[in-house]
Every structure is written in structure tokens, then in C-alpha cells.
Amino acid sequence: QAQLQLAGNRPEQALATLLRLRKESPHHPFVLKLLKNAYLRLEDWRELSRLIPELRKRSVVPESELNELERQVWQNLLEQAAEECQRSRKENPEASLEPLTRLWDELPGFVRRDEYTIRDYARLLAGLGDEAQAETLLRKVLRNHWSDELINLYGRIQGQDPEEQLLIAEQWLKHRTNNPELLLALGRLSLRNELWGKAREYFETSLKLRRNRETLAELSRLNAHMGEEEASIKLLMQGLETDHGLPDLPMPRA
């Protein structure tokens, strides 16, 4: 019956059926599996988080699938907590971010070490105006576990002390001299400190290692603001060619 209800797009009815069945057979693997499916359809992330330990204990789904589900569950719960903080801050701009930070502390260790979960949490913090806390988190993680994904975000976030933030990132360059993502972040952090020449140098070095739309756009924008319109337009054209994968074809000379 529960299967038919799920197949018939009636997840609420299926859930009611399955909860009755679970009272009779609390550990039945098939009931647990269908419960998981019902909660997923209903996007009831909190109940799913409570169900996961039982799914793991009974080996209802493969471990790799369960780990991926757990990441998905906590990611959605973090987003819900951030939305709650956003609503609170509309009423009171000084409202704390406790719903979000408390939930972060609840995360299982392996989820809290996942670079994409860290990235999402840092983005949520920054989006709620706490860039300083986001920068501190990213700095601590990057010191011990390098991630190109996280260094990109680190370059976008303004910490409490932009000068110190740049100096810290420059220390990382000693061991990663040819990392284009780090060089892009350093260019952005140099801009934050109004070090225009240094920023351009970092962007240019990054581009030599990897032609990337994001870096082309940053260097083009900087050149435009430094009065170098021709160089800016040339870079924009290169960025468009990169975007659309244009073939290398002869062109008329200006």
C-alpha cells in the first residue's frame, strides 16, 4: 500500500502508512527504506537526519549512498537554518546566528570535514554578514587541508583584517607557487588592500598557468579601471572565446 501511495505521488499518505508499520516492525529494512523515500519526497530533512543512524545500523542502503544522503540532508538543514536567521535579522538586525552555528556543531565529523559542506557553510555565514567568521573557518581548514574550491571562496570573502588575510594567503604560495586558483585569490585579496599593481601581477601569473574565464574577467575589470581600455577589451574577447569554445580561425587585421 505504501509503495502504491508513493508511486501515486501521495507521499503524505505513504508516510502515515509507513509510520503505522514501523510501530509494528520498528527495524524492518524494507519499511525503513520506504520511510527514507517518503521523507525525501517530502523534503523532511530533520526526520531524515533522525532516520539515518537506523538506516546505517540495519545496512538498509550501501554506505556510500548513505554518506551522500547524509551530506544532502545536512546541507539542506544548514540552508533552512540560514533562512531562519535571515527572517530573524529582518525583524532584528542584531539577531544572532545561533540557529546556524548550533546546527554546524551538530554535524557528524565526516560531514563537517567535507570541503563542499564547509564551502556552503562559509557562504551562508558570509551571506548573513558574518564574513569574519567565514574567513576564520576557511583559514583554519586551508592550513591543514588544501582545497582549490575553498581558496577560491577565501579570495572572495573579506575578513576582519584584509592585510593579514593577504599575508596569510601569501604564506601558502611558498608551497604552491604554480596554483592558479591561489594566485586568483591573491589577486582579489590584493585588490581588497588596494594594491593594484600586485593584483595585476597575480592575475597575469594565474592566467599563464590556466586560461580561466573568472581570472580573465578580473584582469579585464582591473585594466579598465586603470585606464587601459584596449587591454581590457582584448581580455573580454578572450573570455568570450573561452566561454563559447570558438575554434582558432583566421581574422581580418585591424
Regions found by a protein language model. Give the residues of each.
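TPR alpha-solenoid repeat register
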Residues: 31, 65, 117, 150-151, ...
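Alpha-helical adaptor scaffolds
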Residues: 2-6, 136-208
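TPR/TPR-like (Sel1-like) alpha-helical repeat modules
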Residues: 23-24, 36-61, 135-148, 207-213, ...
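Structural register within alpha-helical repeat arrays
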Residues: 1, 35, 77-81, 120-121, ...
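Structural motif corresponding to the intra-repeat A-B loop/turn of tetratricopeptide repeats
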Residues: 8, 42, 94, 127-128, ...
